[in-house]
Design a protein with these regions (language model features):
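Acidic, low-complexity proline/glycine-rich segments
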Residues: 1-10
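Secretory/endomembrane lumenal or extracellular ectodomains immediately following the signal peptide
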Residues: 12-14
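Short Gly/Ser/Thr- and charged-rich N-terminal loops/segments
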Residues: 87
Length: 188
C-alpha cells in the first residue's frame, strides 16, 4: 500500500514564492488523489517498488497515478523554505553544472527554457548525468532525476494564473540544493 508522504516543511513555508493555498491543494488534494487511485489499482501481484512498477507496467492508469505519486514525492523533497535554501548549488553538483553548462546561470537558463517549452502539462528534470529532460503528464524521465519542476497548471495557477515564467522564477528561490546534492551523491 502506497502512502502520501508528509511535507518536509509547513504548507506556508514557501511563501511568498509558492503560496499556502496552492501547497494545501497540490499536496492534500492532487497528490493525495494520485495515492488513493494508485492503491485502488494495484493488486497483491503487482511490483511493490513504485519506480520498478512504473517502468514495467502496461496499465496506463497505474502509470498516470503512480507517476503522479512518484514525481510529487520527489518534488516535495527538492523544495525548502527560502531561509533554509542555500540559494545556489555547491560542491560536486556545482562543479558538474559548471563543467556541463558553463555556470549555474547557464544551467538555470537552459532548465527554465525547457520548462517554458514544455507544451501542456508535465515536468522538467535534471538527471544524475546532468541532462535536462522534459516529460509529458506524469511520465518518469529516463535516468535518475535529481531535480524536478512540476509545470502542471495545478502547481502554480492559483498564484500565477497563466504566468508560468513567473512561477519558474519564483521556484528557483525554494530549490533545496542540499537535497539535490545528496541525491546526486546517492546519500538519500
Amino acid at each position: 500500500m502506497f502512502t502520501l508522504p508528509e511535507l518536509p516543511f509547513a504548507t506556508n513555508a514557501l511563501e511568498p514564492f509558492i503560496d499556502t493555498q496552492t501547497m494545501e491543494i497540490h499536496h492534500g488534494k492532487h497528490h493525495a488523489a494520485y495515492v488513493k487511485n494508485l492503491n485502488d489499482l494495484v493488486t497483491d501481484k503487482d511490483e511493490k517498488d513504485l519506480e520498478n512498477l512504473l517502468r514495467i507496467t502496461d496499465n496506463q492508469k497505474i502509470k498516470n497515478n503512480g507517476g503522479g505519486h512518484y514525481n510529487h514525492s520527489l518534488f516535495w523533497q527538492m523544495l525548502a523554505p527560502h531561509s533554509a535554501s542555500s540559494g545556489q548549488a555547491e560542491g560536486k553538483l556545482l562543479e558538474m553544472i559548471n563543467s556541463t553548462f558553463g555556470n549555474l546561470d547557464g544551467f538555470k537558463e537552459k532548465f527554465t527554457a525547457a520548462a517554458l517549452g514544455r507544451f501542456g502539462s508535465g515536468w522538467v528534470w535534471l538527471t544524475k548525468d546532468l541532462k535536462i529532460v522534459d516529460t509529458p503528464n506524469q511520465d518518469l524521465p529516463e535516468g535518475t532525476p535529481i531535480l524536478g519542476l512540476d509545470v502542471w497548471e495545478h502547481a502554480y495557477y492559483l498564484k500565477y494564473q497563466n504566468r508560468r515564467a513567473d512561477y519558474i522564477t519564483a521556484w528557483w528561490n525554494v530549490v533545496n540544493w542540499k537535497k539535490v546534492e545528496s541525491i546526486l551523491s546517492g546519500s538519500v
